[in-house]
Amino acid sequence: MATTLNPSEISELIKTRIEQVKLSAESRNEGTVTSVSDGIVRIFGLADAMQGEMIELPNKTYALALNLERDSVGAVVLGDYEHLREGDVAKTTGRILEVPVGKSLLGRVVNALGEPIDGKGTLGPTQTAPVERVAPGVIWRKSVDQPVQTGYKSVDAMIPIGRGQRELIIGDRQTGKTAMAIDTVISQKHTGIKCVYVAIGQKSSTIANIVRKLEENDALDHTIVVAATASESAALQYISAYAGCTMGEYFMDRGEDALIIYDDLSKQAVAYRQISLLLKRPPGREAYPGDVFYLHSRLLERAARVSEEYVEKFTQGEVKGKTGSLTALPIIETQAGDVSAFVPTNVISITDGQIFLETDLFNAGIRPAVNAGISVSRVGGSAQTKIIKKLSGGIRISLAQYRELAAFAQFASDLDETTRKQLERGQRVTELMKQKQYTSMSVANQALSIYAVSEGYLDDIPVHKVLTFEEGLHAHFSNTQGALIDKINNSGDWDNNIEAAFKQHIEEFKTTGSW
């Protein structure tokens, strides 16, 4: 017997089904790839694309929109582009490039997109943040008044660096720029400063050596290594610095201190020049595009010391009464010591000072090869440890006078007593400023060495024995005055009691003759 359906039941059933249907409309702008070459794709039809927007291409490949023209968009592919073809569909995403940030990145080696490349598995819990961000405004900034100890006597005494400062390390190839940066990272082991090391356009073997050295010195646990090797595309080398900065800002925004090293921005500028020329942008001086200054200024301005109010506002009241900082140490490689080239002068004008490393000093065995005459720190003086600031005042003058007199003494046959003493003091100061790699020195030991040379205790020590004397002096104080050394390292203060103790025990050590 056939069942008959009641018309009212049919209408009720249709009504129920209609109510259950979920319609979602997603508006996405689509275009067509018209050409692919050298990592650059030209796309016709993406009328609503935004500057810096992520463009989705086939096989989960993404490109970054950089040129917005009347009928087409020029985008740079992030990753491999061999599989892309003319006629492929390209879609806008409405998002700008983001990278993972968070504490789970510490101790890891990642690429420019934040993907781990160290073979240690996936990252732990992370958030994401855009690679491009507006730097903190004037109102949210605080003055730099806390030091970043590099562990180098010559830097901490003459060219001090403060938390939130931008200090350029500049010099020819093979003058110890990377060595100085890595030693600074190693020196932060017990300071609580988180470090980000961005390797731009370097050999994979060099980066592997750096990671190994950080591991050997127990410094990888507080460091994120962002690697954009020489074999990677210009786009990833260009992006890597901004990605590393975003990872460092995560700590600054939450009331912590971070240090970022860009090694080096010369190669980033070359990568950006390559992208710009391929995008047919008009070249300027040295074939760089017109906005190469903005390339570095918008990156380095993100390094800052931010106020308690900024941190409290960013964390929505979770963190109160703490300031955050991001200290930047950009590295620039010069050609034959020419600091007046385009990119070096740009970065010198953006930063708060520069440490100039000289080939002649390096070859003469004076390492770190810091040229005290043209190296300067514009804001670090106010952040210098009290004891180092008090004792190191005469060091820079002694060195400058020594260099001047040494040049003059080559032409003079006989020298008066004062000049001869200045030359001998200068020789000992120069010798004392030498320091081997991976031998970070504490504040107390730096103060001890500077006090000894400033007060003339090394004047009767042969120049070739100065470093041996220094080593013995540090060991003597460590064995007999451990409490005093700890006190200086913890407080950084200077008073008459410390001076009396220094004087007494240096004289005592000299009488032993055990160096």
Swiss-Prot record:
Quaternary assembly: F-type ATPases have 2 components, CF(1) - the catalytic core - and CF(0) - the membrane proton channel. CF(1) has five subunits: alpha(3), beta(3), gamma(1), delta(1), epsilon(1). CF(0) has three main subunits: a(1), b(2) and c(9-12). The alpha and beta chains form an alternating ring which encloses part of the gamma chain. CF(1) is attached to CF(0) by a central stalk formed by the gamma and epsilon chains, while a peripheral stalk is formed by the delta and b chains.
Protein name as annotated: ATP synthase subunit alpha
Keyword annotations of the record: ATP synthesis, ATP-binding, Cell inner membrane, Cell membrane, CF(1), Hydrogen ion transport, Ion transport, Membrane, Nucleotide-binding, Translocase, Transport
Protein location: Cell inner membrane
Record field: transmembrane: none
Membrane topology label: Peripheral membrane protein
Annotated source species: Xylella fastidiosa (strain Temecula1 / ATCC 700964)
Catalytic activity: ATP + H2O + 4 H(+)(in) = ADP + phosphate + 5 H(+)(out)
Residues where ATP binds: G171, D172, R173, Q174, T175, G176, K177, T178
